Amino acid sequence: VFFTGLIDAAYSGASSVVGPAVWGIGGGAPLLAALVFVSVIFFSSLFAVLHHTGVVRIVVGAMARAMAKTMGLSGAESTSAAANIFVGQTEAPLLIRPYLPKMTTSEIGAVMTVGFATVAGTVFGVYVTMMKDVMPGIAGHLLAASVMSAPAGLAIAKVVFPETDKPETLGKDI
């Protein structure tokens, strides 16, 4: 309900800028490009504000510590996995950028696997927008799926790429 309310507010603001015809008000179908662009811009802006205020760091840090302790992961791969739940595959590795050159093959495999397993926040918004009329509780289902996919992706990555070296960030908070 919270995410759908945010998206509805974004669309009502955007319709006042570009006009109601783009949104299908008055009988036409809404333009897919308009739906996608508004979702991408809105969620990018929302995550930028949350990152600037430190909310993202707190939430991602707590999740990363929990994953590192329960799954025996290094700080870099658990931080990237936790960030992948909220941001995309291109943004999450930027949080661990200084550690990338020294990461083991297993850690890099885990970062890539979790990136493919989770849904980026902007894409999350697009999916909710497209599916909210067909499946009213879609936001909760997608969020639960993304949260469950991070540890599942890590487990699969460790089976495919077992850790043979000692990671530099093992036991460290990033």
Where are these regions (language model features)?
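Membrane-interfacial segments
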Residues: 57-58, 63, 99, 132-133, ...
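Alpha-helical transmembrane segments
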Residues: 38-44, 137-156
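Membrane-interfacial helix-loop-helix connectors in multipass membrane proteins
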Residues: 127-141, 168-171
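Long, contiguous bundles of hydrophobic transmembrane helices that form the permeation core
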Residues: 147-174
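Alpha-helical membrane-inserting segments
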Residues: 46, 50, 124-128, 152, ...
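Membrane-embedded alpha-helical segments and adjacent helix-loop junctions characteristic
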Residues: 1-84
